[in-house]
Amino acid sequence: MTERDFDTPVETPTVQPAPAQGAKPAQTVPVVAVVLAAGFGTRFDPDNPKQLVSVGGKPIVCWSIDAFEHCDRVSDIVVVVNPKVRGEVETLVGEMGYTKVRVIIDGGDERVDSTAAALDMLATAGIPDDAKILIHDAVRPFVEQSAIDGSIDALDQFTAATVAYASTDTVLLTEDLGDLKVVKSVPDRPNTFRAQTPQSFRFATIRHAYDLAAADPDFHPTDDTRVVVDYLPDEPVAIVSGAETNLKITTLEDIPTAERIAEEILGRDPKEEARARMHALLAQAAGQMHR
């Protein structure tokens, strides 16, 4: 990715008439997907980086890149890798013929370091402040297109958003008491969600949050949303509906579940899916007419 990819002036957004039912709003800013594939999970097989493990006949990292490559609204993809597997990922990108992958860069020891490396690269490339940045864990290979679209749409109203899935379990907040954990509080279940990715931001927002976090050597966030929540508390973070299938492959025990999801996806009939989407749109339109 070079500076010329992002140096086109962007007009100040103005209020436009609502688009027709089912139509997407006109896109005037870059939409950049950052696929984080730099982790070497200690809970996985240390000799086989999980990003390169095949699921459903395809490396996990390729599933994630595919999701953004096939989204018409995503303009560019940045892949962040561990230097040890850079060659393999570069080969895969070439073999798969991805047209939106602009650059593959080295990540850091922690997830936060990999995101920071991507943000630094984008700043150097001259990306505009209002660009939409979607940061996604490569090891969540089955992200739905609806989650990607929802993330992009959410940034029309907010400067930060995260895909999340409503918790079906009661969540306990704990504290230490002696050698044990004890329950401190029990939040209402309707207010609890499991964070997923992509996590999406206007570039200026996530860049500013990371600049503030960089001054705190003790801060080690597990995701990018928390950087905004902790360092820009006045910036609301919107929730975009996720799915149970958008799982994060963390251990070898997750592979059988991932294989079942991949088998279901590969077995879908595209014509039947298109027909189902059309029926859903017609039903939605009919419902609005009768309100």
Swiss-Prot record:
Record site feature (Transition state stabilizer), residues: R43, K50
Region Disordered: start-end pairs: 1-23
Top-level enzyme category: transferase
Pfam families documented for this protein: IspD
Biological or metabolic pathway of the protein: Isoprenoid biosynthesis; isopentenyl diphosphate biosynthesis via DXP pathway; isopentenyl diphosphate from 1-deoxy-D-xylulose 5-phosphate: step 2/6
Reaction it catalyzes: 2-C-methyl-D-erythritol 4-phosphate + CTP + H(+) = 4-CDP-2-C-methyl-D-erythritol + diphosphate
Coiled-coil stretches: none
Domain of life: Bacteria
Function: Catalyzes the formation of 4-diphosphocytidyl-2-C-methyl-D-erythritol from CTP and 2-C-methyl-D-erythritol 4-phosphate (MEP).
Annotated protein name in UniProt: 2-C-methyl-D-erythritol 4-phosphate cytidylyltransferase
Species whose genome carries this gene: Bifidobacterium longum (strain DJO10A)
